């Protein structure tokens, strides 16, 4: 057999075309067409007509035409003859006489363009399909099927990864292999696509073979699942990951016998208790007529209905009140077996300028006094110092009367009280107040008689004065320790520290560092960069960075923790003062704090405490009884001075507010409508504008937007850094709120010299100032024959063509009077102003 070669698109034989049925020609035309056909074939070098009879069911003419088309389609380039040449000849050869046509050879003339031998002889290894034999066509079909099978084998070649998957799932690959073999067998037997078409000679089979998704039987070919899908990158990533692991089915846990719930649980909490998905619980509640989400709190009735629908019992779990943090400070909650010694907490108290801050400055080797406005401590500071390896914690409280609450707060968290009394000044009102606070807190008192270095110092006189308040020195048989010191030069300061440590040993101060930290807020403020900052004193336990904490009516998580020198600490032991950040709002000075187990519990406790505080405020002002009705009405009849107080720290806010409320002016009281820590903002200005309040800023400034808004709304903002000045200004404003007394003051006399009438303006009076002056803002009294005819205001004041605000004596001017045109020449005008008489 001749060597077979693959057919390309250029040498592949054309598909058999459908030849329409032709009518029988007359005998004369058939003879003429036969001569033309013989001549053309001989000149073109084609194979002579076959003398074989036509197939059964076909006419002679049809067989000739099909043979002619078949032989011409195999010629390279298709230039030897046209496909429908025989048809043209059969119709009479109307195109045979065209110049340059190849059919000119039938007239005996050589072909004009006959330069090559247009032979249809097949090439080496090529099958001659010009011969109309069934074997050659079957051989073509067989070769075509072999090529298709080879191409399919290349396409279905699988990589190593796909071979592994195919080995894992043999059930999916076997039907494909069987289907391929069946198709190949059918094709070889001549009943496939081409075999069926050639055997039957039906043209519709060829059309069916062109459908991509159908096989020879007309059924749709199944999709090839083994073909790689996706981009090359995605297949490469999938190959690295390996075969997908099938997901395991989730085993549903059984329902609990009893659902123990608490008030405020949401769907997420219930899903953990019921071992069910949140979507299932939400769907079940929806079917029960309750629309909710997974974060919404549910009441007791809803939870009980859900438990009944699941067929289980429900029981309310009684839990302790997490919002009540005061119970953690009770003595019965402390385990005495785990107590260890702790440093003493000492509060320094005394009158103004008696040297408390100077003493503390010497102890901690820092300069605090120079930074305080007016040389007075403005808020509590907490510091630590060491002596002979032992630590002492000091709390510095202001001595001014405005800071009464802060001194009381300091006494409540302290172990010892250092009462500083100036030797040259003696006992003062704040000294007595400090003694009372220390006695109320039941804390021992150590008296430090300061300023013994001054010439007029008399320490013995101070000791005698304090004996009247049950502070008897040990020299006189009492139990009160007296130490004579000079804080400025450090004289006898070490002796004072030794007395403190000695007294601490007597008190046996201990704490448990293993419990959750708890303590008190010494000071709090709002920092621009760090947010709310609180100075706290740890009284029990150990505080660490990251602990969830409840502080007063707010909560948070300890983000940073620093000591008085700004050094960051990882933990704070008992009796250690630290500054913490991370709380949501600025707490009140004196609030208690406690570290919770988790942030969720801390948040619940803080929100509940804030809610209770708001309810207490609303209830305190809403109840009116017959006993309080008259007093309430009296208060509403009183004049008030609304004030908004903003300060840098909470202690200053409380001190300034308390001092303002104590100002006594008959018939007037101060109404503090808002207090806060931080800069004065737009909200404060808006509130002041709506209520007519004065804004007092203590050691704070206003934002640029607040300043511009205050200018436009004409809101009075006052800034202070010394509390005395703020109190004096507010007291003056309160005195101004009383009914003012005005007196009339004549500032000038004017005589009308001439009148000028204008239709648009009216009458303009030309006059001269005889005495004093006249201003545009002054009032005028027009007198005619010493009788007042009109009393009103100046509408306009001019000199020449220019408007002026004032005209002095000896000058001429023109003026008009508001709402009055009956002025006459010779009238005398008296200019005057109303001047307020200050209340003494």
Curated annotation (Swiss-Prot):
Region named G5: 486-488
Listed Pfam families: EF-G_D2, GTP_EFTU, GTP_EFTU_D2, IF-2, IF2_N
Region feature (G1): 350-357
Composition bias, Low complexity: 84-102, 169-207
Region (Disordered): 1-251
Polar residues biased stretches: 38-50, 65-83
Single GO MF descriptor: translation initiation factor activity
UniProt-listed InterPro entries: EF-G-like_DII, EFTu-like_2, IF2_II, IF2_N, P-loop_NTPase, Small_GTP-bd, T_Tr_GTP-bd_dom, TF_IF2_bacterial-like
Keyword terms: Cytoplasm, GTP-binding, Initiation factor, Nucleotide-binding, Protein biosynthesis
Positions with biased composition (Basic and acidic residues): 110-135, 158-168
HAMAP family: IF_2_B (MF_00100_B)
Protein name: Translation initiation factor IF-2
